[in-house]
């Protein structure tokens, strides 16, 4: 962000508003969890009861009033007031940013008085910038005082000093019936088909139960759901009769209403005559079980589920059946009548899929997906851990009651609390912290999630763009990474405007790890004003609006009808009524008009998915969604004169007419004109992809590469560098703001963390050192500071970890008495700031009071470092027990370091060329900072890089930035300007150069730096924004002559840190074989690897049966001078042949001897045939 001289040097929070909006879905989900989500979840946790048969007393235990406190510092004085804990303190002290989690544990004997007691459930991790964070509401000046960057946006956790972000994972769309065809459905049981309708039902506490309706080949269906790791399958007719008091005729008519003799398939009918036969089969199955009434069906269910459910052994069978239907069947609905209507709708959709009157839904399409946000996953995981804790408390009480020798008194609440404390409640907070540290869910039920690991990742601050991408990333799921099929990786049209088609990595995670577009957002439980929504009130308002517009509500005993005469209306998975097909279009337009009105009863992010009737298309209906965790994005509603902005979702987008802002009609006829319009074409790509200037002029793979290389750039990662203690930080010493820039740079304040340098680039085949993407750097430019950088590494020394429990606090930082080390280490035992350290030099001294000895910590590595920063943590100890020592590595550009432009043109530095030998302009005296080969452009087709060079030259000459936002010619001009310009972009840029006397196309006449003569051709030269990547030779070079070898194979070990060698693999072997370099091959794989002299018996050919026999040496008759006596000759014999006549010495790789030993362990004998050079066998 550029700050004018007259303005304050400190920006305001309004400057970072758009940047903070990018991580809103992380923070709002956590805020809702702490404000209301925990209360809702606690209400869903069932109490546990313990019965004492001796006293006939029953004790009930449940949880209430959860409360998470803001992070506070540990206070060692009981009277002192606790101070808020700041995030930077956690980073430096390597502790977690957590607050205390308290809750009431309620006890009640029989029908007596409820006794509440506050329990400490441990430390709960707090998300930065949430309402419980110390930085919430802080302006830029306060953030600076708190030692944070002014652009700090939060959305992550700090655990043991490490920043971790919760990864957004794709999940099936909640409360939406999805029809699909899978071969795995056929393998359930005999008679099952591959067709089913799957519904992921989510409660208000975010826990979910997936209900599947399987189609059987005999025409019937089965309802399936999971209970404690096992799937239970019920006849669909049994469930229908157990839900309501409907008779067989009413159920038959409800199922058959989707078929009418007056409508054919061409009219959009979804039912056939086979529906009648299937309805009879469903009812006959129930009748064959001898079940005729609702009560009989419920008792039948209760009889089978009473042994399965916990805590219902004493309940009646009807109550058990009610618990099953309430807790496992369509749990998002609280009314049995609503569950009955939804099940009827799902049966009709299943039969439509079977009869091929509708297509199956695509579970890999964003249309049928939503996001698992951090607050929701933490809530459901916390719920399971609290339920396990209650069950463990119940088990402890039962075991104590069964123990006849125990002095435990069940009537004494003090004894009960004492026993419960054996099951430490603080483990609850530890389990949540472990989840965020490892990203793994330790659950027995699976929580109805598709994966149990990979939910959190470390938020690396290699540069700001990499850090930002963690919050915008959307992962398909770890379980899909191992699939051989590429279906889940495909870029589907439904994701237009929601997922970026460019910003995805190449390689294994390609298509699985995507990123949200610049304008895409995730809905939450908060409205636009920051108030928590009342979803019951919202749904009631929507139903009232629909009823007033002509919808017929779904009431019991009401005559039903189906498509195409009427279509069903579903609101958040509830069938609320039906609409006449003639009214649907008008009702949809009316709802959209209410959405964009400011004071509206309809929420602004309501998804209005109207699926019209068609011949064999998607199943028709009006699907409304107001729930959280959905994708939304803004578009213009041009059907309303005021051009209001409307928020739409991926489900409704497929069936809408949205035009792009190029003025055309997109091939539409006059009867289906567009009702909506895109705000800007760049809204379909991510923030990182938007930073590429004129990306529409590049080949798409180059834009993909740039998205990855922008996140590997050595840049200005953070403003609070001096207060951070990260394990490794890359820092660019002389960053610059690009001259050619898109509007995204200003919108999201990217200039607060620049990523590169404006270098003068000449496209010239000047020497042989620029072939194959190599580049030549101007040596003088580098010496003056171009692309200079550092790597900061922090060593954390914690003496409390080194102390044993017997001599706690016996170690301290203290300098030894050896005066030779005083110039390296200060009196406090720590190094002085600014000191230069070489490898194996001590930088820290630790004194042990028990042994009275001093131990030194020595510098590891191969290059010298500078001590940049030293911090200590005093705590309550007399001496410091923890220290952070940050080292600074100089990383100036050298040969082999990697660079790239913003267009995917990457290469390594091949030479640092002297400035006097570089080509120069005879008029301006300008010499390039960087030379690249012209062969880099034709095959890559990065035209935008050429445009950037011309534009940056013109912008530098005129002293202004150049707007390089892509899709320039496709955007309509507003504010009274012309709709499009007739001139080309290159002509507009060339005119800027012409005004200053330069060539229209950016070429210049250069002179040779060697001879001083004019080069024959004109050279294309201009400023290009170049990025220095983190891949540097100083961190990767590996060479050795001799060193450690593996004890087992005697081959060189691997690993750069261990002084290992470089692997000579199959490809290297094949290349030497192809060249016929047999001697070199022998040297690499034998002589210089694991050369070994072995004794082999030529008689039996054995390698493993040789042994050494000691021979007595005869006494020397006369010594020769003062020479020592010779070595005793050894005699080698063969155990198998009992002779030493055939023993020969053979040179071989040692791993060959190891192979012979391994084969011998499996009773496989290896025999060698020895021969001399003439080929004669011994």
From Swiss-Prot:
Zn finger residue spans: C4-type: 1097-1137
Pfam family, one: RNA_pol_Rpb2_2
UniProt cross-references to SUPFAM superfamilies, sorted A to Z: beta and beta-prime subunits of DNA dependent RNA-polymerase
Keyword annotations of the record: DNA-directed RNA polymerase, Metal-binding, Nucleotidyltransferase, Nucleus, Ribosome biogenesis, Transcription, Transferase, Zinc, Zinc-finger
GO CC field: DNA-directed RNA polymerase complex; mitochondrion; nucleus; plastid
Catalysed reactions, semicolon-separated: RNA(n) + a ribonucleoside 5'-triphosphate = RNA(n+1) + diphosphate
Presence of keyword Transferase: yes
Source taxon at top rank: Eukaryota
Subcellular location, principal: nucleus
Record-level GO BP terms: DNA-templated transcription; megagametogenesis; ribosome biogenesis
InterPro entries xrefs: DNA-dir_RNA_pol_su2, DNA-dir_RNAP_su2_dom, DNA-dir_RNAP_su2_hyb_sf, RNA_pol_bsu_CS, RNA_pol_bsu_protrusion, RNA_pol_Rpb2_2, RNA_pol_Rpb2_2_sf, RNA_pol_Rpb2_3
Documented EC number(s): 2.7.7.6
Deletion phenotype: Defect in seed production due to female gametophyte developmental arrest.
Keyword Zinc-finger tagged: yes
Subunit comment: Component of the RNA polymerase I (Pol I) complex consisting of at least 13 subunits.
Functional summary from the UniProt entry: DNA-dependent RNA polymerase catalyzes the transcription of DNA into RNA using the four ribonucleoside triphosphates as substrates. Second largest core component of RNA polymerase I which synthesizes ribosomal RNA precursors. Proposed to contribute to the polymerase catalytic activity and forms the polymerase active center together with the largest subunit. Pol I is composed of mobile elements and NRPA2 is part of the core element with the central large cleft and probably a clamp element that moves to open and close the cleft.
Protein name per Swiss-Prot or TrEMBL: DNA-directed RNA polymerase I subunit 2
């Amino acid at each position: 962000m550029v700050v004018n001289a007259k303005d304050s040097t400190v920006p305001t929070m309004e400057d970072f508003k758009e940047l903070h909006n990018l991580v809103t879905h992380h923070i709002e989900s956590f805020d809702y969890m702490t404000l209301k989500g925990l209360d809702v979840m606690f209400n869903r946790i069932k109490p546990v009861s313990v019965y004492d048969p001796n006293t006939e007393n029953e004790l009930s235990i449940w949880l209430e009033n959860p409360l998470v406190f803001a992070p506070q510092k540990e206070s060692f004085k009981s009277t002192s007031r606790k101070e808020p804990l700041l995030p930077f303190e956690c980073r430096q002290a390597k502790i977690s940013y957590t607050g205390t989690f308290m809750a009431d544990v309620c006890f009640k004997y029989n029908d007596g008085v409820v006794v509440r007691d506050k329990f400490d459930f441990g430390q709960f991790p707090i998300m930065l910038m949430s309402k419980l964070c110390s930085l919430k509401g802080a302006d830029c000046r306060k953030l600076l005082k708190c030692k944070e960057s002014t652009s700090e946006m939060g959305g992550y956790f700090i655990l043991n000093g490490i920043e971790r972000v919760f990864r957004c994972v794709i999940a099936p769309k909640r409360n939406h019936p999805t029809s699909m065809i899978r071969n795995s459905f056929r393998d359930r049981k005999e008679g099952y088909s591959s067709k089913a309708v799957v519904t992921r039902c989510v409660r208000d506490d975010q826990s979910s139960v997936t209900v599947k309706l399987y189609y059987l080949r005999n025409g019937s269906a089965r309802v399936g759901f999971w209970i404690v790791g096992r799937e239970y399958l019920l006849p669909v007719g049994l469930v229908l009769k157990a839900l309501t008091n409907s008779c067989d005729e009413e159920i038959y008519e409800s199922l058959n209403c989707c078929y009418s003799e007056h409508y054919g398939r061409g009219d959009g009918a979804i039912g056939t005559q086979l529906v009648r036969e299937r309805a009879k089969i469903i009812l006959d199955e129930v009748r064959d079980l001898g079940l005729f009434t609702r009560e009989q069906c419920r008792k039948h269910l209760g009889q089978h589920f009473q042994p399965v459910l916990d805590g219902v052994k004493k309940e009646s069978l009807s109550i058990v059946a009610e618990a099953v239907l309430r807790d496992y069947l369509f749990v998002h609905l609280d009314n049995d009548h609503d569950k009955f209507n939804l099940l009827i709708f799902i049966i009709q959709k299943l039969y439509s899929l079977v009869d091929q009157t509708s297509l199956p839904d695509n579970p890999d399409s964003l249309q049928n997906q939503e996001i698992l946000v951090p607050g929701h996953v933490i809530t459901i995981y916390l719920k399971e851990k609290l339920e396990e804790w209650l069950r463990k408390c119940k088990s402890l009480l039962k075991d104590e009651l069964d123990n006849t020798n125990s002095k435990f008194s069940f009537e004494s609440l003090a004894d009960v609390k004492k026993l419960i404390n054996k099951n430490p409640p603080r483990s609850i907070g530890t389990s949540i912290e472990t989840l965020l540290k490892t990203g793994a869910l330790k659950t027995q039920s699976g929580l109805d999630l598709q994966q149990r690991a990979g939910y959190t990742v470390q938020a690396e601050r290699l540069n700001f763009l990499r850090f930002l991408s963690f919050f915008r990333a959307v992962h398909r799921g770890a379980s899909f990474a191992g699939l051989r099929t590429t279906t889940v990786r495909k870029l589907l049209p439904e994701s237009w405007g929601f997922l970026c088609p460019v910003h995805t990595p190449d390689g294994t995670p390609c298509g699985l790890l995507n990123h949200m577009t610049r304008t895409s957002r995730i809905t939450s439980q908060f409205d636009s004003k920051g108030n928590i929504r009342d979803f019951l009130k919202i749904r009631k308002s929507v139903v009232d609006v629909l009823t007033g517009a002509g919808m017929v509500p779904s009431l019991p005993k009401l005559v039903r009808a189906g498509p195409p005469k009427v279509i069903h209306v579903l609101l958040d998975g509830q069938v609320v009524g039906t609409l006449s097909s003639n009214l649907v279009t008008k009702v949809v337009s009316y709802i959209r008009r209410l959405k964009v009105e400011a004071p509206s009863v309809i929420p602004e992010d309501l998804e209005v998915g109207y699926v019209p009737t068609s011949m064999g298309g998607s199943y028709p209906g009006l699907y409304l969604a107001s729930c959280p965790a959905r994708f939304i994005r803004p578009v213009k509603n041009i059907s309303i004169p005021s051009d209001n902005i409307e928020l739409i979702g991926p489900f409704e987008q497929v069936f809408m007419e949205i035009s792009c802002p190029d003025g055309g009609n997109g091939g539409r006829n006059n009867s289906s004109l567009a009702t909506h319009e895109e705000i800007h074409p760049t809204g379909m790509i991510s923030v990182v992809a938007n930073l590429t200037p004129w990306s529409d002029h590049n080949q798409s793979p180059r834009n993909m590469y740039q998205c990855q290389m922008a996140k590997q750039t050595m840049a200005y990662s953070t403003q609070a560098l001096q207060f951070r203690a990260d394990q490794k930080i890359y820092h660019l010493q002389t960053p610059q703001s690009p001259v050619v820039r898109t509007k995204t740079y200003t919108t999201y304040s990217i200039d607060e963390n620049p990523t590169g340098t404006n270098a003068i680039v000449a496209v010239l085949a000047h020497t042989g050192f620029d072939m194959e993407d190599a580049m030549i750097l101007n040596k003088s430019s580098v010496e003056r500071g171009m692309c200079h950088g550092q790597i900061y590494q922090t060593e954390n020394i914690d003496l409390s970890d080194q102390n044993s429990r017997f001599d706690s606090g016996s170690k301290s930082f203290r300098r030894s008495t050896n005066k030779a080390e005083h110039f390296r280490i200060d009196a406090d035992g720590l190094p002085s700031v600014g000191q230069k350290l070489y490898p194996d030099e001590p930088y820290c001294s630790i004194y042990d009071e028990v042994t009275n000895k001093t131990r030194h910590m020595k510098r590891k590595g191969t290059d010298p470092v500078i001590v940049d920063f030293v911090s200590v943590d005093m705590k309550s100890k007399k001496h410091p027990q923890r220290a952070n020592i940050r080292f600074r590595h100089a990383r100036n550009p050298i040969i082999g370091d990697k660079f790239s432009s913003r267009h995917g043109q990457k290469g390594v530095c091949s030479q640092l060329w002297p400035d006097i030998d570089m080509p120069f302009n005879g008029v301006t005296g300008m010499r390039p900072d960087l030379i690249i080969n012209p062969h880099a452009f034709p095959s890559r087709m990065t035209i935008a890089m050429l445009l950037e060079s011309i534009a940056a030259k013109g912008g530098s000459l005129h002293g202004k930035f150049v707007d390089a936002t892509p899709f320039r010619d496709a955007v309509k001009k507003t504010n009274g300007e012309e709709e499009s310009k007739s001139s080309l972009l290159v002509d507009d840029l060339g005119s800027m150069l012409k005004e200053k006397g330069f060539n229209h196309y950016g070429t210049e006449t250069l002179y040779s730096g060697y001879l001083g003569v004019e080069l024959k051709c004109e050279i294309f030269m201009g400023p290009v924004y170049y990025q220095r990547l983190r891949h540097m030779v100083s961190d990767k070079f590996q060479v050795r002559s001799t060193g450690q070898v593996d004890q087992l194979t005697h081959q060189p070990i691997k690993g750069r840190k261990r002084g290992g060698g470089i692997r000579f693999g199959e490809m290297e072997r094949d290349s030497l074989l192809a060249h016929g370099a047999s001697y070199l091959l022998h040297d690499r794989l034998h002589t210089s690897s694991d050369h070994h002299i072995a004794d082999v018996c030529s008689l039996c050919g054995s390698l493993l049966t040789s042994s050494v026999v000691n021979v007595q040496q005869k006494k020397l008759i006369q010594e020769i001078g003062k020479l020592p006596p010779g070595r005793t000759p050894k005699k080698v014999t063969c155990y198998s042949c009992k002779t030493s006549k055939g023993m020969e010495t053979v040179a071989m790789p040692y791993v060959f001897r190891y192979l012979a030993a391994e084969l011998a362990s499996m009773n496989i004998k290896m025999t060698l045939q020895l021969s001399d050079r003439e080929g004669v066998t011994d």
